[in-house]
């Protein structure tokens, strides 16, 4: 039966397989209540909105290693910072879609607006990561000098690299308090993916 579930993300499948078997009556009841709400949702929602939600869930990736590093006060690299930003934007988009149909309290997704603000200083809401000039005035000035004086590239690039690493360290420190919320958001999205797949299988 699990193999027949049309899950949108590989992480949701791993999360489902790793989940402990429920034995407490209240947990089982809660699980069926959630599934019932998702069944009603897929029956009533228009196909375009459902397809949009399913498509977004395809973007859910397994970033548990990154989250572990964030918990452990590690300085995240550019790829890890991208993963956190991507998840935060994805979680916010999915939460908004569910809120439109009063489904946001069925599976609650932690608010990650502050995470987005930290990683998206220019407010572009694009799920890519780059050490923007907005992070550091000194870095902005240095990059301008690099464009104006290409003959000094080697020395200036070394200095820029040191400044960029400082930005990564600062961003990681700012993000650390949100490590648990990011982790919970990843799990919530997997739960939504699983329940949607089960609900569609029941149709």
Identify the role of each PLM range.
Residues 1-138, 142:
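Conserved amphipathic alpha-helical "coupling/scaffold" segments
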């Amino acid at each position: 039966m699990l193999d027949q579930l049309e899950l949108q993300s590989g992480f949701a499948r791993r999360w489902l397989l790793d989940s402990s078997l429920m034995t407490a009556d209240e947990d089982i009841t809660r699980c069926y209540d959630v599934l019932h709400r998702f069944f009603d949702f897929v029956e009533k929602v228009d196909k375009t909105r459902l397809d949009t939600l399913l498509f977004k869930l395809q973007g859910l990736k397994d970033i548990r290693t990154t989250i572990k590093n964030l918990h452990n006060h590690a300085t995240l690299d550019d790829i890890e910072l991208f993963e956190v930003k991507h998840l935060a934007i994805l979680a916010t988009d999915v939460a908004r879609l569910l809120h439109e149909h009063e489904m946001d309290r069925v599976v609650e997704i932690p608010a990650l607006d502050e995470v987005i603000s930290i990683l998206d200083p220019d407010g572009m809401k694009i799920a890519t990561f780059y050490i923007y000039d907005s992070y550091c005035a000194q870095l902005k000035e240095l990059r301008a000098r690099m464009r104006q004086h290409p003959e000094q590239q080697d020395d200036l690039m070394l200095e820029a690299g040191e400044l960029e690493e400082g930005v990564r360290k600062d961003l990681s420190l700012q993000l650390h308090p949100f490590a648990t919320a990011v982790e919970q958001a990843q799990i919530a999205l997997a739960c939504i993916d699983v329940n949607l797949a089960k609900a569609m299988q029941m149709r």
